[in-house]
């Protein structure tokens, strides 16, 4: 059977099939997982919460368990976590508007009141104390400081410049430096830069450990030599004391023998009188 054009249609042209659904990358769901689920076990974050040098959030109990069973050593993304020294305790500021099973974030920035996990804002973590602030808070407070500095006299410029290095936490006033700041859940170029920084840190720690291991044999050799020297000095002192005692004993025996011979002579002479 043909149509007007003289062509014979195939079955696939006559039967309509349902189109496959194309899965769209849901950025909001991914962000939710990063901010409120443990990066290792994917369970809900609950205190104590910890952070690594790449800005990943974990439940501390999951990290401890993974360290004990050795699963982190073969992990593709978290092999840099080698001990509890590789993580930092996070002290989030609680959000009073949060309720259980609600979509409101359980934490917020104590300065700007921005909820933690907002996709339009970055959050910074302080290694020294564990507090978390939005990047906007750092910018706003920095602008306030610069405005105050501009109002000061020129005579105080040196004091102002020297105080720039003395950074302190907005909550606990604990001092820190710029290297103590970690971006939580970074993305793009910042994440790649943090990976490079972490690799350099691990390489430097390996160099330091290798230097320490090279110095250990020398220390052992020195300690062995000192022990041998002390033992030899002890032996020589012991021999000297022994020789001195023997000489004293010989002198005392000689003196006693002379005294006995004199006494015997006196006894033999008395009967003749």
UniProtKB/Swiss-Prot annotation:
Segments forming a coiled coil: none
InterPro entries: Rtf2, Rtf2_RING-finger
Domain of life assignment: Eukaryota
Main location per the UniProt record: nucleus
Feature: compositional bias, Polar residues: 225-244
One annotated GO biological process: mitotic DNA replication termination
Region of interest: Disordered: 202-247
GO CC list: chromosome; nucleus
Keywords tagged on the record: Chromosome
UniProt biased composition (Basic and acidic residues): 211-224
Localization, UniProt: Chromosome
Pfam families: Rtf2
CDD domains: RING-like_Rtf2 (cd16653)
Keyword Ribosomal protein: no
PANTHER family documented for this protein: PROTEIN C20ORF43 HOMOLOG (PTHR12775), REPLICATION TERMINATION FACTOR 2 (PTHR12775:SF0)
Family: Belongs to the rtf2 family.
UniProt function note: Replication termination factor which is a component of the elongating replisome. Interacts with nascent DNA.
Name recorded for this polypeptide: Replication termination factor 2
Organism: Dictyostelium discoideum (Social amoeba)
């Amino acid at each position: 059977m043909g149509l007007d054009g003289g062509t014979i249609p195939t079955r696939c042209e006559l039967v309509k099939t349902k189109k496959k659904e194309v899965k769209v990358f849901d950025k909001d769901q991914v962000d939710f997982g990063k901010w409120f689920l443990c990066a290792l076990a994917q369970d809900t974050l609950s205190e104590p919460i910890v952070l690594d040098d790449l800005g990943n959030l974990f439940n501390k109990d999951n990290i401890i368990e993974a360290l004990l069973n050795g699963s982190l050593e073969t992990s593709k993304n978290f092999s840099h976590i080698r001990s509890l020294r590789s993580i930092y305790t996070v002290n989030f500021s609680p959000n009073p508007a949060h309720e259980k099973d609600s979509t409101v974030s359980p934490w917020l920035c104590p300065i700007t009141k921005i909820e933690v996990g907002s996709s339009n804002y970055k959050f910074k973590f302080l290694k020294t104390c564990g507090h978390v602030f939005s990047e906007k808070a750092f910018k706003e407070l920095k602008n306030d400081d610069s405005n105050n500095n501009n109002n000061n006299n020129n005579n105080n410029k040196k004091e102002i410049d020297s105080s720039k290095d003395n950074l302190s936490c907005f909550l606990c006033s604990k001092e820190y430096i710029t290297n103590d700041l970690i971006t939580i859940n970074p993305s793009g170029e910042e994440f790649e830069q943090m990976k490079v920084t972490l690799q350099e840190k691990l390489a430097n720690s390996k160099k330091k450990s290798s230097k320490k291991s090279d110095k250990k044999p020398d220390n052992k050799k020195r300690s062995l030599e000192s022990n041998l020297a002390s033992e030899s000095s002890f032996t020589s002192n012991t021999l000297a004391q022994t020789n001195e005692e023997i000489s004293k004993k010989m002198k005392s025996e000689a003196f006693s023998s002379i005294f006995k011979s004199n006494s015997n002579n006196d006894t033999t002479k008395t009967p003749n009188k």
